[in-house]
Structures are given as C-alpha cells and as structure tokens.
Amino acid sequence: MDYLDLGPYSSASGTVRLPGSKSISNRVLLLAALAEGETTITNLLDSDDTRVMLDALGKLGVKLARDGDTCVVTGTRGAFTAKTADLFLGNAGTAVRPLTAALAVNGGDYRVHGVPRMHERPIGDLVDGLRQIGAQIDYELSEGYPPLRIKPATISVDAPIRVRGDVSSQFLTALLMTLPLVKAKDGQAVVEVDGELISKPYVDITIRLMARFGVTVERDGWQRFVVPAGVRYRSPGRIMVEGDASSASYFLAAGALGGGPLRVEGVGRASIQGDVGFANALMQMGANVTMGDDWIDVRGIGHDRGKLEPIDMDFNLIPDAAMTIAVAALFANGTSTLRNIASWRVKETDRIAAMATELRKVGAIVEEGPDYLVVTPPEKLTPNAAIDTYDDHRMAMCFSLVSLGGVPVRINDPKCVGKTFPDYFDRFAALAKA
C-alpha cells in the first residue's frame, strides 16, 4: 500500500489559493450542459469527481472544450442528445444523484453505476421522488442503491413531490435542478420535504446557482419548494467557481494549530458555501480568525493557554467541515462533542466509525454514537500512528493535521485525495514547518 509520512511539524504559515469547489463545479457543469447557450466556467476543480461528471456529459452528447481550469460548455437546451449510455460515476455523489434525476426525464435508456462504495450509498429516496412523476428506474443489485437502470418514461407533475430530507440533501438538489425540464400543471412543480432537511447550505448553493442560470426557486422555510416547470435554463455567459470551503478547513485549522499567520484565498464572507461556517466553529474554540470577502486569516490561538477550547456543537449544517473539528479536538484542553452528524454514516465511508477508529490510534478516548462523536484528547499524541483513510479524501486530509502536534504520522493511501484535491499534500507541506 502507498503511504506518506508527515512531520513532525511545529508551525504552519503562508498563503494558499484554494482549488474550485467540488459542490459548485459539478452543479455548474450540469446546469451549463442543460442550458441554452454557451457557458465559460473558470476555476473549475480538476479532480476525480469532476472528471467523472465531464466524462458522463461527453457521453451524453454535450460539447465540452477544456483548457486548464477553464471549460466551455455548449448547452443542450434541456435534453441530452444521446439516448443510450453506460455511465461510470466513481464515488461522486454530486454527479450520480443530479444526473440520475436529469436522465430520468430525458427519455432514454441509461445505466448509472460507480465504485463498490457508491453501490452502498443510498439513492432510494431520490428514486421514490422521481417515480412519483412517472420515472422508470430499476435497481440492478440492491433495492435503494446503485447501480440503476433508467428507461424512457412519460413524465407528468400533477401533485406535490415528497422527498425525505434527513439522509442526504443531494436528493432534494437533484429534484430541484431537474424539475424546470419537465412540464407541470399550472407551470410549476412543488417539492415537499419529509423530516428535517440536513445540510441546508448545500441546497442554498443549488438554488443560488439555478438563479444564475435564470430559474428562480421559491421556498417556504426548508420544507416546501416551488420550481418553475417547463422553462429553459439560460447560460449566464461566464461563471467563476469559488474556492472549496470544505478544503479550506484543513488550512484554517493548520493556521490555528501551527500558529500562523496563514491566509486562505478563494472563500470568505461573500462565499455561497455553508462550510465557511467552519471559521466560526474554529473561533469558538479560541482561534484568532479574521475574514474578508474572499479570504480568511488565522493567526494561532487568541489566548495564552496554548490549546484550543473544547467545543459542543450541532454540525448538521456543515457535516464535511465538521470532520476537521474532530481532529482539531485532539488539540483542545477538554472533551469536545460533535452532534447531529448522522449523514457521516453514508458518505465516502462510514465516517463516524472511521474517525473514531483513527482518533484512537493517536491516543484519543472516543465515544461513538449513531449521530454523534465525543472526543477526549490524550495528554500526548501517539507518534508514528498509521492512519487508514478508507478511500475517503477527507479522512486523509484531516489527519495530516496530527503532524502539527510535534509527532510524525503516516497517511495510508494518500492518493485518495484525488477525489477533490489532488495536490493537497504538496500544498500542506509548503506551509508546515519543522
């Protein structure tokens, strides 16, 4: 197995420019593909997850011209030209869920599949929602999970569509992005969410990006959404993908743990991503944080006790960035509790179980619950821990921070960061100092 040894490091400082947001990149690619007109996308993320989306769109007949982090997409005016396709989408939830919905109303025969872990990640709630409007979708192996077979169907929207919101916000995102493509009674489609909607900021990203492409979604709280139906997305001409706020969390934490000053460029107060809220969580733990419209600075810890304060917080809104808090909790002066993180169970791996296992390797006492994690830091971090990453990019990036505790750490399968941030470890090494 490949591995990477990091540290020991005692400080971290410098400036890092973030790669484009994964969540925004894949949404914008699909919206541009479905729109009328040509869209020039800049600062597009180059990663495993965006590559599978680009590959799928190409197979569906979308004209794409890529040059570095710029991609020119010629829209299909609401319908993919390819009426048969076999689409491999890796482990990219941001590709498989929205594409499944778009294909379900496209009148073709399609197969959607991915890596083995993708076939363990639920999609049944989305399929149930699509079946309510007439979609013909079959499960190939296990009920409720990919691979999927999608067949031509007569689509009609004549009643509110109900979808669960407590497993993944991507099911709602997929429906919202697809419903403008179909005709509905009274010219509008209504989606009603059953249960508490998790990861609300990601749905907000979807709605904001749809508006950039000319479609305005109205919402009543987070339970009822009204979407114009039978309308056409219109290209905004040019759109820039802002930096990835989830990826920012590792560098912001490094600036706190390693003293800084460390500046992250590409996200800030003007960001549309909820994960910029990570900076507020870090401030609650005592980090010295300042923020501009598109940058965030961290200069160590804002008191003289030398350790972060423990935190007890509901992380329902920022589940991805919360993983970084779990590792930062190793550097706190007491026990931290991360609540309302049940969605971790159905991500790239079971992140609650994985995080608990790996935190224990570096000496933490960890209590693992169905939707929470309690982390008590050790007196001293265990050196030379070999961290398993479970083919999960965020596990690898989070645990790089252990090296800032003055101990060496080994990251197994470091190339898994290719899912969202292929050169992460090069960027981290440029900032961390012995």
Swiss-Prot record:
The active site is at 320 (proton acceptor). Pfam families: EPSP_synthase. GO terms for molecular function: 3-phosphoshikimate 1-carboxyvinyltransferase activity. The keyword Transferase applies. It is found in: Cytoplasm. It comes from the Bacteria. It catalyses: 3-phosphoshikimate + phosphoenolpyruvate = 5-O-(1-carboxyvinyl)-3-phosphoshikimate + phosphate. Its main location: cytoplasm. CDD domains: EPSP_synthase. Pathway: Metabolic intermediate biosynthesis; chorismate biosynthesis; chorismate from D-erythrose 4-phosphate and phosphoenolpyruvate: step 6/7. 3-phosphoshikimate binds at residues 22-23, 27, 168-170, 199, 320, 347. GO terms for cellular component: cytoplasm. InterPro entries: Enolpyruvate_Tfrase_dom (IPR001986), Enolpyruvate_Tfrase_sf (IPR036968), EPSP_synthase (IPR006264), EPSP_synthase_CS (IPR023193), RNA3'P_cycl/enolpyr_Trfase_a/b (IPR013792). Its EC number is 2.5.1.19. One of its GO terms (biological process) is aromatic amino acid family biosynthetic process. Keywords: Amino-acid biosynthesis, Aromatic amino acid biosynthesis, Cytoplasm, Transferase. Phosphoenolpyruvate binds at residues 22, 93, 121, 170, 351, 394, 419. Catalyzes the transfer of the enolpyruvyl moiety of phosphoenolpyruvate (PEP) to the 5-hydroxyl of shikimate-3-phosphate (S3P) to produce enolpyruvyl shikimate-3-phosphate and inorganic phosphate. Belongs to the EPSP synthase family. Monomer. This is 3-phosphoshikimate 1-carboxyvinyltransferase. It comes from Burkholderia orbicola (strain AU 1054). The gene is aroA.
